[in-house]
């Protein structure tokens, strides 16, 4: 049986938009670790800590299923007690997004399989931005929303970690 990680084991404070805690970007340390980094940003962990926990759950950045399936990211969020919407919602506009969501960008087909890059959308005080874990970016807190082309999103509905 999986044991959920307790809040006392965290290094940083978790995100809670009601308390005005600002989320910090987490840079992925592996070329394909955007899903792990996105969860780390939501939960408030460093990449190495989130990576270690993900690995203990059988989730590895090198696994191609992590790049093209949603279940691994949902499993990691569940482990931390984070609740999400039950389905992927097609992206319509930045204004229509909830205050906190996982977004799929750079969505593409490769050999008949879908792939994307995970990022986190945050709206604080009426202003939206994206936490993008890509290592080569000048800033991992992005406000150039028009340059991104989201395909769909998953709403994060409860960040009250247990």
What are these regions, as identified by a protein language model?
Residues 18-21, 124, 158-159:
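A generic structural signal for solvent-exposed, polar alpha-helical segments
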């Amino acid at each position: 049986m999986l044991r959920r990680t307790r809040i006392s084991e965290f290094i940083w404070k978790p995100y809670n938009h009601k308390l005005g805690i600002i989320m910090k970007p987490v840079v992925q340390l592996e070329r394909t670790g955007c899903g792990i980094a996105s969860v780390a940003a939501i939960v408030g962990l460093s990449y190495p800590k989130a990576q270690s926990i993900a690995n203990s759950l059988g989730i590895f950045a090198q696994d191609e299923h992590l790049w093209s399936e949603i279940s691994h990211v949902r499993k990691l969020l569940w482990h931390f007690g984070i609740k999400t919407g039950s389905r992927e919602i097609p992206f319509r506009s930045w204004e229509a997004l909830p205050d906190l969501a996982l977004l799929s960008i750079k969505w593409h087909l490769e050999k008949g399989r879908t792939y994307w890059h995970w990022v986190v959308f945050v709206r604080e005080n009426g202003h939206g931005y994206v936490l993008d874990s890509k290592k080569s970016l000048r800033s991992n807190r992005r406000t150039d929303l028009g340059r991104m082309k989201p395909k769909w999103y998953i709403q994060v509905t409860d960040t009250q970690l247990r």
